Amino acid sequence: MHDARIFNSSSNKTMNQNDEAGKSKIKPLRTNQRRVIGASKSSSHMGSHVGTTLIIGKNSHSTSHGVRNNSPENTIVIGRRNFSDGQIEYTKPASHSNKFKKDSILRDPNIDSNVEASKKLSEQIQLTVWFHEPRTSTEDVIIDASVIPGLKEGDICELVPLNTFKPHKKPKRLIFIIKNQSLLSKSSSLHTSNNNNNAGATTSTLSANNNNTTKTKTNFQISLISNPLQNLMDLPPRSLVQLKTILDVESIEADTIEIFIKDINLSRDLMWTFSSSLVGTCVYSEKRLTFLSNRTGVVKKIYKNGNELFSALICEKTKVVFRSKSAKLVFLVQLSREMWHFEETGEIMFHKLVNTLFPKIFKKWRDKNTHHAITIVLFTSVDLTNIPWTSLGQGERPNNRRDYFRVVVDQVSIFHWDRIMANLRLEFANFKRDIMLNCQPENNGKFTMAGQSLPSVKGNVLEAINVGIHLVNDRFKNTDLKHSLNHFILVTPGTGLFDVDYSLMHETSKKMLSIDCALDIVCLSQPPLHIVPLFRYRDPSKDGQISHCVPHWCDISFYKDSTANSTQWIPHCKIYELQMMGVMENEINDVKIERYRVPNEAKSMVEAMDKYDSDVFKPVNKDSDSKVTRELSSSPEQSTINSKTGTPKENSKPLSLIWNNRTSLLPNSSTARIDVSTTNSSVLGTVANSGKDVSALSSLYTLNKTSADKSVVHAPSIRADSRKGVKENVSRDRKEFNEITRTKLRPRLQKTEEFYKSDDSVSNTSKSRDILDSKSRNKQSSTKVEEEFETLTNLLWTEIRNPSKESHSDMLSFLRLSRWNDIFPSNIKRRLVKWRSFESPAALPVTTSIFPSTKQLETDYSFQIYSVFLNSENDLEIESTHDLMREMIQLRLLLGFQICYSDQVKKFESSRKPGGNAESLIKYFPKGSCYGSRIYMSLDDEIHRISCDYNGNLYVQMYRKIEELKHSRLLGSKDYRQQSYVPLIRTRYVDEYAPAKFDFINTKPLKYNWNQFDQLIAGYDDAIPPEKRQFHKMKFVVLPANIPKNAYFISNENLTDEEIRVEGLRKLIGLIERGKFVKSDDKESKRKEEILPEISFYTGNLYEFLSDQAETYDATGNEPSNSLMLGENMRFTKSIKLSQLAQELQSPTGVRLVDRTWHFKRHLHCFLGNELVSWFIECFEDIDNRNDATSYGQSLMDRGMIKHVESRHGFLDGYYFYTFEGEYIDKNYKPERLNSGWFNRKKNSSEKGSAVTSPTYTRNNSDTESAKSPVFPVQDNLDLRKITSNSIGQHMYDSETSSMAGSSTKTKQKKKFILSRSVKFNADPLKKSFRPEIVTVHYDRVHNPEHCYHIRLQWLNTTKKFIDDAILNWSRLCERHGLKLVETPWLELCTIPQVNPFHSFVDLKLVINPWTDPEFSDPNILKDNKFYYHLYLMKKSDFLLDNRSTVFFSKDHIEISYSWGKPIFQYAQYIHKTGAYIVELRDNGDLFLAPNNIHITRLNTSLSSVPEQDYLKSYKMDSQKVMLKFRSACTNEKILRGIFKEAKENWREKCSEVVLPAIN
């Protein structure tokens, strides 16, 4: 290997130009260095001390033309060469290792393996590295096949830089797989070019050039992608690297990789598919990954055997963890009484939260460029009883208590961190006052103090978790396309010990296992000396005995300020007397600490301290052994009494309690018989307690009392242990003591620090525990853990018998039982604070190793089986059983299921008879045939086995756990199932706390009928009724915005703002219609595609428009004789005479001619430009597209046949009014006489309203009926809900009902209209996905430009990334036409508090009531419309109508519905033009406001993705300003009176229709 270690030599040695003729040269990096690579000989001149070079190449075959020769004669030639001598060659015997063959690595079977080359490539070879740009090639590594022969597709190579400049730094290894695209040969000639930057460094890029000469084709050996590998590996251009092939593939396989995603909603089903696509590939840290041709994530961490790697291979066993940098975080901050206490460092707990913890988290978020949306809620529980909480026993909580929740911020972007912190500090300052003061109306409205806040150990932690779970209870409601997951963070000042109710603990645990959200508990106090998190409860199955458990669904962290002195000792236990010593010393409370006297015989202070330590920690003598033996032999009753008192018997010094607590952890001490040594969170902190039932504060009271006083202290009334439990404890401890005495171990010194080591690290166990754990005990314990893991009895939590003395194996058992176990890399030490979980929360893994035993599945589970057959005609366009099985698996993953993949699953599958085959189990979906495959999936207490037999039949076998009988309720405990849990919640802008409108505890997660789901996916639409298909839904409104400078324009035309916006809506609908999903065998002709459905625009009254439409249809909904349907024989050409064409256009089969009203201007005998264009395409043989039709229409205008009604435009394809010139008007046409005045016209029932219809030309397809008119088919019997209350709509729409007054006395048959159209939209037109991505789009067919235009989306399992891309395209089109696409909630505003209790709301009452104010209570105005002033205020404040109330649709002769369902809105709803706020108008005239959080979050997230965030700060959506401005207008009498005066003046000038377009 001496020849392989080549270093740079002097630059004066150059090669002879004549000898190297025809060879290409690499331009030197510096002028004083020169390296020459010969293409013909494939040699590398790297220099040596003796003037030799390393020759890598072929002997007998020239490779100057890049020809790959795989003949056995080809060998790699490595030798020493002097420029004046010939080439020296030598070869080595060939040997090929079969170990390199790996099933997960795909290879081309047509490429023969080069035996000798593989042998030689297993050794390190030095090459010169070049770099290429991503625009040239996306491959990470490109290798010249002629330079390194023998490489073939599928080989795994390792590249290591020769970093001679930084010998102290370990070089990074790059693992990569040889692909067909990464090997360059003659067919893919590349040209190299050098680009010099400012620093003088050379960056080599590759560009394809088929016309280059031979000498420029192979002037490089290996090239890496410049970004990011050049910076990551710290490689300068033209540096040396070592290359070799990897034979032992298992040595480079990663155990766990972490992929970070941002600004994308990657659902769990796509995580599974994404992970499957990564199997068999190599990744490196900071590698950008693409999925479905979209940038999806970045690899951040790679682990193997507890070590972090730079690069590795992903195999099927690799755990792929996804972390989100754009998640929805909910902070639940427990403001228990400890939050106002001082810590040992002198800092108040809450100041520690707001001054150190939150700022540090925000700083990490900003440094990592995360885009989270956070919600912060303060909560606490107030004890309303007069009983001191210290008298409560373990596991007990006061029955009479009241819970408070205060919302600080709700779904706010972390970009506003400064405002968030200001609100947090303000709310903390007022929180205690607000919850303690209660107004007494019967006592003249005076405020009184009621109750006291409970400590964290007795707080409402589980209740707060249930309230948070309600936010994510329904997975179909998560339609945020920018945030991937939800995460809960509970901040508490306690130590991680909580007293809970058993039934509530059980229900909460089941809910947490049924959702895919994680919970992190952050404790602000010091870590205790017991296992955490620890939940303590009274177990009904054990007659109320105290039990401790560690749940499997949460993690815990202990925050410690890094600025504190690391050398400062902080006690883990808080003792009140020591804390207050020197501050409140008096005769009543006196703590005496004797001064330590140095012995006279001591030579030095160090020797004195050593002697003291020796005396304290001296070995246990025989007397103490006998004493323990006598105590263990005592009666059970005496043991129970000792356990309750827990006080020392001999030493009565004030500090004896501290010492006894330290020694109580010794297994052979007198307190070894006590089961639990816990830390209770007291009024002043956490206090150590050696007694099991004595409270912490009660023990503290005994510090300064005499022995006579100690006898007065009583234990709590409820006993924790029964006699049977005490006997078992005594028997077990006696056995442990006998094992210790029989071993006759040498006594050793017990150090204090051993008893205070944290149990958070499973590897650190005390030495005293080693004495207790003998070989037999270890063997039994390990066997017991394995048996417990084999037969899982409780997946919710692990019961802990002694939290302060837990064995290593028991800790491993509950760590293995978590659904989140796969996100933790093996052999990695976990930190005290899980910053990574706060910065980028992890998604629930798609796989789990948890699986019940065969015996449990046979006895504790019910069984059900059904088959699924594919319907060839299905909405999801599934074409094969292979695709159907994949969709069934992905839908389950989307709704929270995990794939069971472990040895236990294989064991169960092997035991199945008949047909059990563990080899057929799959973790990822096979790329080929799925016949014979089977997969197990689990969620909560449900397991599904999906299998496909070799005949192509799909079967689903479901195992459901049989519910056990409920335990009887303990006396004195609270039963949450029999009464609703109604806490008091105060949202962001509300002044007072109000009862919640939902029972958060008794509401369980949704359960789905999977048989119906699978049948629906298979194509059977009747499996689930349409009204029950509550899948993913999104609603968008199109609002008018400012016209941009680059707005849409037409040459030589001056369009108004309204005309530009109307044209934008038409183009938007055209874009949706052209994106319809059409099968390849169902393509329409180009002529038919040019005729698209049009929007029917109108102004004024909607019912006048619909009444006009109803007159053209009979009661059955059929078209009259003068239909627009054209016969097949009606075809014209452009040569038709103008007179004949005018006659045809005005005939019953021509274009629709009506009298139209637009903005109160009457246009007689006119038509629309877009309708005429569609008529031309349908009727003219020589017109096939809309452009030709528009040009022909312009020619008709130029020839004087038609004209614009106002002579402002030429002929345009759009919503423009045109009429005939006088000489071409039909002689039989007689204009109707117009009545003078708006009121008279309105009362004339025979007068047609402002009707504008859509084209009704035949399309010869399935959409014919829906394209004709908005009339709903008669066979669709839709009945609107009846509204019996006298609500707002009855008064608000009097002006509209009056338009029907003239016909109300006549009996008319009800006409049914559908005002929207549904389209199966293809969200993936470029076919990037492996399946059809279909979304159902509903858009309005009638629209008033002064209202909101609606677009609604519905889908089941479509990839959200494609939906987001489609929405972005629509939004860009809207912006160019002065429109804004805004996302709004699907449901109406008044229902949101039931979905999200933390959503901010504002209730407004007008400071002036126009109904009672003498100045505005004009009977003429209020009689016509009671809400006239309210609606004018809305219009004045830039609010547009969104939803009408249901009363508006309850007319006698017209029934209105939509393609997405029935309109059942209770109140009229309006949206601000910015999209930031939504307002509802109530019956009593009050206003109900709420921010449009989904739009605000989406907008701020998009702006945050731009690098220069500070520059864009002014562009951030600030909904609070909109609310404050509107609230000031409603609550300021002067401003509101001025608005109402203006409204009254306008009423006098105009009719009500002029002022009230916003109500139609």
UniProtKB/Swiss-Prot annotation:
Record organism? Debaryomyces hansenii (strain ATCC 36239 / CBS 767 / BCRC 21394 / JCM 1990 / NBRC 0083 / IGC 2968) (Yeast)
Task: List where Basic and acidic residues composition bias occurs.
Answer: 617-630, 767-776
Q: Which residues cross the membrane?
A: none
* Protein's recorded name: Vacuolar membrane-associated protein IML1
Q: Which gene encodes it?
A: IML1
Swiss-Prot/TrEMBL keywords:
Membrane, Vacuole
The terms describing its cellular component in GO are:
GATOR1 complex; vacuolar membrane
- GO molecular function, one example? GTPase activator activity
Compositional bias of kind Polar residues? 7-19, 631-649, 1247-1264
**Which Pfam families does the UniProt record give?**
DEP (PF00610), IML1 (PF12257), IML1_N_fung (PF24438)
**Subcellular location(s) of the protein:** Vacuole membrane
What family is reported? Belongs to the IML1 family.
**Chain spans, region Disordered:** 1-30, 188-212, 617-654, 756-784, 1237-1270
Concerning InterPro entries, the annotation shows: DEP_dom, IML1, IML1_N, WH-like_DNA-bd_sf, WH_DNA-bd_sf
Query: In what way does this protein cross or attach to the membrane?
Result: Peripheral membrane protein
